[in-house]
């Protein structure tokens, strides 16, 4: 049986949205056990008597909050739901760690408690984002686990993302591109020029450089980038999308009757667009390169994204993603 | 544990972690200058030291540890 360790206290809607999502996904994942870490009384109250099978609660007394400094928090708040869950995974009792809490602290739990896979230089954070071309979206790695990157790291991240795209997203021979400031081979600073050369020498389906405006077009299934650029890029995409949607809604609803009628007529088209850019069904961002999948979903998430993230984690466990990485990186050392 | 035993354990740990020759590890070896250790390497090392020696190294103390010799001295003086 697979086991997922869940920090039930992370995020704005904890623990209710988390427990509700677990109860919703449980009948679908019959070979999976869910261990919830957090305030025992609060969690218990949310679980009906007849739905307690394959559910365990482990009581913890502290919570890591967003304002906590990540490394200090995981070293000091030893009885926090996140740290106790991470140690549970480290001990081998669960195969994956899931949280909606402080991203930095979760990354620190992954890197320092669960630990790096031997041969992996640096773990990296990878979400799946929507694209215009494909309903499957694309992966971008690293979006901020590393402030400083080396060319060799980018190659390992591409390899890990490649396994993920093949095994979890079912993409055959995924295309891999390097995010750069131009499409030509010699573009970029020394880090990106060297990364380009190294990526070209791999057996990955590397299609070269792409620029920022190519990302959402879906020019590649996997975009590799240094953590600094990746983080800035992700925030720019999220921020731009949010502003456009807000302005669109505002201009349709606050400009008299005609735009309102227009919006009503355009509703099926707008709904289809919304569905296409529905990020919830892609699940959470995964920290790849540590000894168990560590997965983060947005702190504001309601049941739906949490539900899909649990399905995504279950698939990673079924495909033994970490086992594949261990085999691969022990050979390449 | 004697100073020599502590040194040997730490040297083994560093040799494995940073893939460098065990013979090249001396007490003067500086984590940042000689190993090119960044903050992730350093925190990993400190947590590894805590696990290996069953010691708790507070952040303020950890920040002061710059060489292998200083780490050996710290572990020796904080043994249970």
Curated annotation (Swiss-Prot), chain B:
Annotated ranges, domain Carrier: 1-79
Predominant subcellular localization, coarse grouping: cytoplasm
GO terms under cellular component: cytosol; membrane
InterPro entries for the chain: ACP, ACP-like_sf, PP-bd_ACP
Transmembrane stretches, start-end: none
This protein's UniProt keywords: Cytoplasm, Fatty acid biosynthesis, Fatty acid metabolism, Lipid biosynthesis, Lipid metabolism, Phosphopantetheine, Phosphoprotein
GO BP, sorted A to Z: lipid A biosynthetic process
Pathway assignment: Lipid metabolism; fatty acid biosynthesis
O-(pantetheine 4'-phosphoryl)serine PTM positions: 39
Family statement: Belongs to the acyl carrier protein (ACP) family.
PANTHER family (alphabetical): ACYL CARRIER PROTEIN (PTHR20863), CARRIER DOMAIN-CONTAINING PROTEIN (PTHR20863:SF76)
Protein name: Acyl carrier protein
């Amino acid at each position: 049986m697979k086991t997922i360790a869940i920090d039930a206290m992370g995020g704005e809607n904890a623990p209710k949205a988390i427990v509700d999502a677990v109860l919703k996904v449980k009948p679908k994942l019959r070979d999976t056990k869910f261990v919830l870490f957090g305030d025992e009384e609060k969690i218990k109250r949310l679980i009906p008597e007849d739905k307690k099978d394959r559910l365990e609660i482990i009581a913890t007394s502290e919570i890591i909050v967003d304002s906590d400094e990540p490394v200090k928090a995981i070293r000091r708040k030893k009885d926090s739901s996140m740290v106790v869950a991470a140690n549970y995974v480290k001990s081998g009792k669960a195969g994956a760690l899931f949280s909606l809490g402080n991203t930095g602290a979760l990354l620190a739990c992954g890197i320092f408690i669960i630990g790096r896979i031997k041969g992996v230089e640096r773990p990296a954070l990878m979400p799946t984002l929507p694209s215009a071309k494909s309903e499957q979206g694309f992966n971008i790695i690293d979006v901020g686990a590393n402030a400083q990157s080396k060319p060799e790291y980018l190659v390992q991240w591409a390899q890990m993302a490649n396994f993920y795209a093949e095994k979890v997203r079912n993409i055959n021979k995924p295309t891999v591109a390097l995010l750069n400031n131009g499409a030509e081979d010699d573009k970029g600073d020394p880090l990106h020029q060297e990364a380009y050369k190294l990526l070209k020498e791999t057996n990955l389906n590397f299609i070269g450089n792409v620029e920022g405006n190519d990302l959402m077009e879906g020019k590649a299934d996997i975009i590799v980038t240094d953590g600094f650029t990746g983080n800035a890029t992700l925030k720019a995409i999220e921020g731009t999308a949010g502003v456009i949607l807000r302005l669109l809604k505002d201009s349709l609803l606050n400009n008299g009757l005609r735009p309102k009628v227009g919006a009503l007529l355009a509703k099926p088209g707008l709904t289809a667009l919304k569905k296409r850019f529905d990020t919830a069904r892609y699940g959470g961002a995964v920290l790849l390169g540590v000894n168990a999948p560590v997965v983060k979903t947005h702190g504001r998430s309601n049941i739906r994204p949490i539900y899909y993230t649990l399905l995504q984690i279950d698939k990673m466990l079924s495909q033994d993603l970490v086992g594949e990485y261990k085999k691969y990186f022990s050979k390449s050392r | 544990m004697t100073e020599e035993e502590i040194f040997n354990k730490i040297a083994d740990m560093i040799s494995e972690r940073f893939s460098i020759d065990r013979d090249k590890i001396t007490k003067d070896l500086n984590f940042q200058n000689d190993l090119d250790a960044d903050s992730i390497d350093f925190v990993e090392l400190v947590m590894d030291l805590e696990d290996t020696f069953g010691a708790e190294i507070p952040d303020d103390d950890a920040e002061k540890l710059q060489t292998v010799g200083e780490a050996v001295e710290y572990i020796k003086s904080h043994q249970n």
